[in-house]
Design a protein with these regions (language model features):
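Sec/Tat signal peptide C-region and signal peptidase I cleavage site
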Residues: 18-22
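PEST-like low-complexity, intrinsically disordered acidic/proline/serine-rich tracts
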Residues: 27-52, 56-149
């Protein structure tokens, strides 16, 4: 009996040090198609596990809606060079993202291009806000030019 207890304790200890990682899928997004949009940032939330941009975007009829744009977390953004002040509320931005399949005003961010005019904060430089390996993207961080929708 004592050998079983020792073996069980060793097995439990070995399993407990394995990295634990859980994540939801991105099946609610249409990752087969890119959409390009422009708007004004309302809020920026750099949270774990996902950061969020809330952006006012006008549709073809001129109606404005607030869109929720899901990005990678702060660590992933930092890893690919996105700085805290690159995008702030009130900034104009252009995004490329994957829309929600249900038609709601939200998308999975791929890229953000700040259009605020401040070169020190990356004006006109497109940055990867998915962290270089998320939903539908190759792990290398190299991306094919998407087709606009």
């Amino acid at each position: 009996m004592p050998i079983r207890v020792v073996c069980l304790a060793v097995a439990c200890a070995a399993v407990s040090v394995l990295p634990v990682r859980a994540h939801h899928s991105h099946t609610n997004y249409d990752i087969s198609t890119w959409t390009t949009m422009e708007g004004t940032v309302v809020e920026v939330h750099r949270l774990v596990p996902h950061s969020w941009l809330y952006v006012e975007i006008k549709d073809a009829k001129g109606q404005t809606a607030t869109w929720a744009l899901e990005a990678t977390g702060p660590g992933g953004l930092e890893k690919v060079g996105v700085k805290v002040n690159d995008v702030r509320p009130g900034d104009s931005i252009k995004v490329r993202c994957h829309l929600l399949k249900d038609g709601a005003t939200g998308c999975l961010l791929g890229f953000v291009t700040p259009m605020h005019g401040d070169a020190a904060r990356g004006h006109g430089i497109e940055r990867d806000w998915d962290g270089g390996g998320g939903a539908g993207f190759p792990a290398t961080g190299r991306f094919a030019e998407p087709a606009a929708r």
